C-alpha cells in the first residue's frame, strides 16, 4: 500500500542534510548512507549515493527517472547464483 499523500514523501534528516551540503559545495564524492527507506528527491539528481545492501555500499548515480522511488530499490540485497544444474545433462 503506498504512502498517504497527506503525509508526503519520507527522507531521513541526516541524509537530507548530507544532500544539501553536497549540493551547496558541488562535491561529487559519493554520499554513504544506510537509509534504504528514503525517497529520492529532485535535488538529489546528479549525485552519487552509496547505498548499503547489508554487506557493502553500492554506488547509485541518481537520474531524473529515479525521483519518487526509494534508494533501496537500486541496491539489491540478494545475489542470484542460478539454479543447480542437472547432473544427467552434464554427462551427455
Curated annotation (Swiss-Prot):
This is Small ribosomal subunit protein uS19. Gene3D superfamilies: 30s Ribosomal Protein S19, Chain A. Part of the 30S ribosomal subunit. Binds S13 and L5 and cross-links to the A site tRNA. The gene is rpsS. PROSITE patterns: RIBOSOMAL_S19. One of its GO terms (molecular function) is rRNA binding. Keywords: Ribonucleoprotein, Ribosomal protein, RNA-binding, rRNA-binding, tRNA-binding. Belongs to the universal ribosomal protein uS19 family. In the E.coli 70S ribosome in the initiation state it has been modeled to contact the 23S rRNA of the 50S subunit forming part of bridge B1a; this bridge is broken in the model with bound EF-G. The 23S rRNA contact site in bridge B1a is modeled to differ in different ribosomal states, contacting alternately S13 or S19. In the 3.5 angstroms resolved ribosome structures the contacts between L5, S13 and S19 bridge B1b are different, confirming the dynamic nature of this interaction. Bridge B1a is not visible in the crystallized ribosomes due to 23S rRNA disorder. GO terms for biological process: cytoplasmic translation; ribosomal small subunit assembly. One of its GO terms (cellular component) is cytosol. Pfam families: Ribosomal_S19 (PF00203). The keyword tRNA-binding applies.
Amino acid at each position: 500500500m503506498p504512502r498517504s499523500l497527506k503525509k508526503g514523501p519520507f527522507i531521513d534528516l541526516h541524509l537530507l542534510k548530507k544532500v544539501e551540503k553536497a549540493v551547496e559545495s558541488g562535491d561529487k564524492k559519493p554520499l554513504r548512507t544506510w537509509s534504504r527507506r528514503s525517497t529520492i528527491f529532485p535535488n538529489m539528481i546528479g549525485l552519487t549515493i552509496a547505498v548499503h545492501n547489508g554487506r557493502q555500499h553500492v554506488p547509485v548515480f541518481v537520474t531524473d527517472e529515479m525521483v519518487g522511488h526509494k534508494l533501496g530499490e537500486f541496491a539489491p540485497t540478494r545475489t542470484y547464483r542460478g539454479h543447480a544444474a542437472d547432473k544427467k545433462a552434464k554427462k551427455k
